């Protein structure tokens, strides 16, 4: 069995207690930093318990796909989001085949161990000029502390974000990088 799935299945029931920001704060955060607008087809990648899924839906005003490898996380997400236009799916990102205008990976990037496979799949799924947004509402230092007890098959330490961005060169154009004491943002646009 997949160790990332096993880990997140085991913590799903208490996961939302870890989020320190209110829904309103998360809504403002997403609207400020994620280049998403009404009408965009979006994927909430590694959606967990659906912390930002309804925010993405409220912005795009259209159906949202939300995928997570953990069935327990998906159960929590479904219980919080009773909306027929939000499609939760328990699956590996590598099995997704729909096309999107934007893929948002919120608070999950360190759990994608094979960054090149992640990059290739995101590129495949994005429409022309589509966005890949990797965003955390924690700093790298906070993330490293948060993940310090996890094995390397569940999470990895992030390099400075400008270094993480290098693997996306040739596939994506970098739109914005933020790597500070409060957050991480790597906003990328599919190169044509």
Question: Language-model features: where?
Answer:
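Class I SAM-dependent methyltransferase SAM/SAH-binding core
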Residues: 43, 49-94
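Conserved alpha-helix/loop element of class I SAM-dependent methyltransferases that forms part
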Residues: 21-38
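Conserved class I S-adenosyl-L-methionine
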Residues: 133-158
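A conserved beta-strand element that flanks and buttresses the S-adenosyl-L-methionine
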Residues: 104
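Core SAM-dependent methyltransferase catalytic element
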Residues: 171-192
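Short catalytic micro-motifs in class I SAM-dependent methyltransferases
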Residues: 107-108
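A short glycine-rich, Lys/Arg-flanked "PGG" loop and its adjoining helix->strand segment in the class I
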Residues: 116-128
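Short alpha-helix
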Residues: 155-171
């Amino acid at each position: 069995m997949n160790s990332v799935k096993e880990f997140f299945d085991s913590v799903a029931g208490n996961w939302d207690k870890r989020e320190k920001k209110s829904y309103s704060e998360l809504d403002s955060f997403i609207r400020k930093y994620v280049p998403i607008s009404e009408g965009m087809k979006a994927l909430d990648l590694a959606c967990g318990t659906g912390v930002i899924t309804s925010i993405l839906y409220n912005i795009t005003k259209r159906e949202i796909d939300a995928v997570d490898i953990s069935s327990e996380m998906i159960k929590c997400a479904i219980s919080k989001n009773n909306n027929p236009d939000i499609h939760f799916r328990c699956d590996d990102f590598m099995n997704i085949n729909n096309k999107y205008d934007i893929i948002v990976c919120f608070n999950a990037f360190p759990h994608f161990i094979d960054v090149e496979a992640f990059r290739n799949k995101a590129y495949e799924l994005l429409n022309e000029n589509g966005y890949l947004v990797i965003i955390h509402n924690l700093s790298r230092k906070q993330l490293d502390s948060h993940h310090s007890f996890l094995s390397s098959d569940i999470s990895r330490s992030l390099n400075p974000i400008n270094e993480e961005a290098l693997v996306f060169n040739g596939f994506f154009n970098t739109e914005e990088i933020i790597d500070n004491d409060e957050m991480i943002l790597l906003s990328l646009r599919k190169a044509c």
